[in-house]
Amino acid sequence: SFTSADEQAAFSIYDASNLNPLFDYQWSRDGLAASKSMSEKLIERNDPRLSRVFIDKDWNQMTGSADPKFLMAVNGENEEKQYFYNTSVFTYSQTAPTLFMSYHELLFLKAEALCRLNRSNEAEPVLKAACVVAIENTEVSVVAAMNAPSVVGYVGLSEKTAAITTTTAETYFETSVKPLFTATPLKEVMIQKYIAFFGASGESVEAYNDFRRMKALNENFIVLKNALN
């Protein structure tokens, strides 16, 4: 078992021609938009990632939900338009590593196991570490997007906010996550894990597996807003 993100199983040899799969798909099709339900989860928690992970149609980073160009696609009701809705910054993360097994996933699994064993006191510091490491991984992908060779060749994205520091991530946990964890430990672990998997790291399959697993257990922790599903 690894003990830091430096030891995680990452495919990290992307460059200007060997492309991150999410970037490759979006760059060739321009067919993705940012999810309103995901933005709502960030807004509800005053999550600092909100000011880092969304881009408007003119390639400007969104500073938050009050930004005049903050326009998310309503899940299941969005219009089929290009260059209209905001997109996630991750679709521009040309060189961001694909994580086969990330350090934050390992920590989230440990926190979940402890909660299921009714050992939430032990789970809390593990969840805090998971959240901090997950935010650090978000920043890796943001940096990759801001420096993406193909994107920079077309002027590039306009970065409007500062990187999230470890101190800010820890404060976020203490002020926003911890109260929710105290009230419903397992639920908040799974929601934080779901948010952490929002990115360019290829972890959506794990998020889908978690969602199926929770449904089988009649655990409706993750609320999806697409009425067509």
Where are these regions (language model features)?
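Extracellular low-complexity, Gly/Ser/Thr-rich intrinsically disordered linkers
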Residues: 186-229
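Hydrophobic-face positions in mid-chain alpha helices that act as interaction patches
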Residues: 1-109, 116, 124-192, 196, ...
